[in-house]
Every structure is written in structure tokens, then in C-alpha cells.
Amino acid sequence: MNKYTLPKQSSSALISIDVQNDFTLIGAPMEIRGTHEKVLQMLQLLTAFRAAERPIIHVIRLYLPDGSNVDACRKEMIENGMAIAAPSTTGAELVDELKPDKLIRLTPEGLLQGEFQLLGKQEWAMYKPRWDAFYQTTLESRLHCSFGNL
């Protein structure tokens, strides 16, 4: 590493991606193997960022039951009735252990409109319409404008 690639802790943000029940919990419909085993390590990172009052953004997916916002590789499953990260379901929620407060619930209406949902001090959730959290979202501008030189 050099001075241009060395991480700067004082100006860093933490981004969690798809750490939702339907992708993380053992036996979940779209379990990503090995993710559940990493929840404790993720919690340690989140705890450190919370203590340092650094920004945290949880990037999530929400799939509408009609399949209108679903990636092509999952669209047929959703159209055939499979519920994956469906708005307002337990499966769409962030894993409880990683939330700043286990009672917090995602608000899909605002998230689906591109709003960032405040979860705690310096902590938000945001919806991504496709695989890339920067595609058709305001994530990049929010990181630069809201949090300074990250």
C-alpha cells in the first residue's frame, strides 16, 4: 500500500450488503452459504464503526411479489410464488444481531422510492434495484456529500 491506497479510518464508511434473513439465515430460501457464520465478525465491525460514530449503510434488496423489480435470474421463481426478500416480511429484514436496535423494522415504501432509512446514529438502510449498490441509486453522492472525503 501507499499513501493513496492506505485506508483512512477517520474518513471511512462501512457498507453491509444483503445481510437480510432470506440470504443469511441457515435454511433460508436464498441462503448464501457461509454468510451466517460471519455474522459475529460483521457485528464486531459494526460495533467498532458505531463506537467511532462513522457512517454505516446497510444495502438491501426487496423483491416485489409481481416480479417487476426482480433480476432476470430470480424473476421466474418470484413469479411462481416464491417469496424472497418480499417487502414487510421477516425474510426481508436485516439480521437482528446486526441492527442497532432489534425492534427496528425496514420501511419498504420509502426504501423502494430511493429514500435512505435512518436506523440509528450515523446508520441507514438503502434499497438497491440491482446487484450493484451504486447502480440507479444515490449512494455515491451521499457518501461524498454527506460524509465528506471518504
Predicted feature locations:
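N-terminal start-of-chain detector that recognizes signal peptides
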Residues: 3-4, 28-30, 79, 123-125
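Short, glycine/acidic-enriched loop or turn micro-motifs at the edges of active sites
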Residues: 21
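Structural motif
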Residues: 12-13, 55, 149-150
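Short, glycine/acidic-enriched capping/hinge loops at junctions between secondary-structure elements
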Residues: 25-28, 68-70
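Short amphipathic alpha-helices and their capping/turn segments at secondary-structure boundaries
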Residues: 1-13, 43-51
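Active-site alpha/beta core segments
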Residues: 39-147
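Active-site flanking residues adjacent to catalytic metal/cofactor-binding acidic residues
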Residues: 17
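Short glycine-enriched, charge-decorated loop/helix-capping segments at active-site entrances
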Residues: 27-35, 83
